[in-house]
A protein has these predicted regions:
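Short, glycine-/aromatic-enriched active-site segment of Class I SAM-dependent methyltransferases
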Residues: 143-162
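Conserved N-terminal segment of class I S-adenosyl-L-methionine
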Residues: 1-105, 111-115, 125-128, 162-165
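A SAM-dependent methyltransferase catalytic signature shared across enzymes that methylate proteins
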Residues: 169
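A short glycine-rich, Lys/Arg-flanked "PGG" loop and its adjoining helix->strand segment in the class I
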Residues: 125-140
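A short His-aromatic
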Residues: 116-120
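Hydrophobic residues within beta-strands of alpha/beta enzymes
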Residues: 70, 141-143
Length: 169
């Protein structure tokens, strides 16, 4: 884990949609995202991994440094095209797809990684059912979501793209 990872900055920046890390998100957000992928990379070493809502692809590429294989899935076609063109590795591919209807067969991955995704979905049950469907028995689910009480202490969502924020309770 001694190697340094540098996120590739696209020549033409992806537009801020509230649903992926871009250059306009700020350094604190980038540090938090990279930290999550550092943890996931340790947990996913040598495994077949699905990165749901992979965004511009930097995290999937980072996971691919130690995973057997990585599939990054994102709902936005332009983002998938960017990821495919920017992060080309033999054990890494990107697909367009929805977190509630993952375009992969049953039981095809050892680990599912999904960071800052569930709060963008109304259908949490459908998302979690899809994670279960694509995981092999005994698989790992590495997930994070901003805690509403920390990121939105007034109770109102601080990000208009968060449709169902979570709390500890």
């Amino acid at each position: 884990m001694g190697e340094i990872f540098k996120r590739t900055v696209p020549d033409v920046p992806l537009a801020w949609t509230g649903e992926r890390l871009t250059n306009s998100a700020g350094p604190q957000v980038e540090i938090e995202h990279l930290h999550r992928y550092f943890v996931a990379r340790t947990l996913c070493r040598g495994l077949d991994v699905l990165d749901i809502a992979c965004g511009e692809g930097y995290g999937s590429a980072f996971l691919a440094q130690t995973a057997r294989s990585v599939v990054g899935v994102d709902v936005d076609q332009a983002t998938v095209a960017h990821a495919s063109a920017t992060y080309a590795e033999p054990n890494l591919r990107f697909l367009e797809g929805d977190a509630r209807r993952i375009p992969l067969p049953d039981g095809c991955v050892d680990a599912v990684v999904s960071f800052e995704t569930i709060e963008h979905l109304y259908e949490h049950d459908a998302f979690l059912a899809e994670v279960r469907r694509v995981l092999r028995p005994g698989g790992r689910f590495v997930v994070s979501s901003p805690e509403r009480d920390v990121y939105s202490p007034t109770g109102a969502a601080s990000n208009p793209y968060h449709v169902r924020e979570l709390t500890r309770a």
